[in-house]
Amino acid sequence: RWSIALALAALLAACGTRPVAPPAPAPVVSQVSEEQAQHVTITALGLVGTPYRYGGNTPQGGFDCSGLIAWVYRTEAGLQAPRTVAALQGWGQPLPANQLRSGDLVLFGNGGPPTHAGIYVGEGRFVHAPSTGGQVRMDRLDARHWARQQVSYRRP
């Protein structure tokens, strides 16, 4: 009798279901090819050291953060990016941090609309035009100042 119960228990255990893995998130669709994204990245890195200028949108005249993004995307991908950080929040597709690739946008804020933006260049780094008196530079997303910000990511 015990052997029948044991055999039945073994049979039922063998019929158990395997845990189902959650589906992978759908890839984010982009207007920018991977090759264009690489050109965006290379061009952004090449602008490091360009002076900051409020309202600036050329390498000769300097850049503010949205001007840098607009110039790079127009030059390398033929896209017209919005010229304000608030408008960049609606440009392209949102994406989770684990899908971030070079050429994507990073937007920073403090709980309200974003107030600053840059171009992700890989390995946890981004290029941006930070402030008056400064220059276009590369920073790390995990640097103290940026890690405290609310961050979102967009793929044009």
Please report, for each region that a protein language model flagged, where it lies by residue.
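Bacterial N-terminal signal peptides that target proteins for export
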Residues: R1-I4
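...with weaker cross-activation on analogous glycine-rich loops/strands in unrelated enzymes
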Residues: V28-V29, L79-R140
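Glycine- and charge-enriched low-complexity intrinsically disordered segments
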Residues: H145-P156
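Bacterial Sec signal peptide processing site at the extreme N-terminus
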Residues: A9-E34
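Soluble non-cytosolic domains of exported or imported proteins
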Residues: Q31-Q38, P59-D64, P94, R144
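Secreted/periplasmic proteins that engage bacterial cell-wall peptidoglycan
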Residues: R53-A81
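Extracytoplasmic/secreted envelope proteins and their assembly/folding machinery
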Residues: Q38-T41, L45, G49, S66-A70, ...
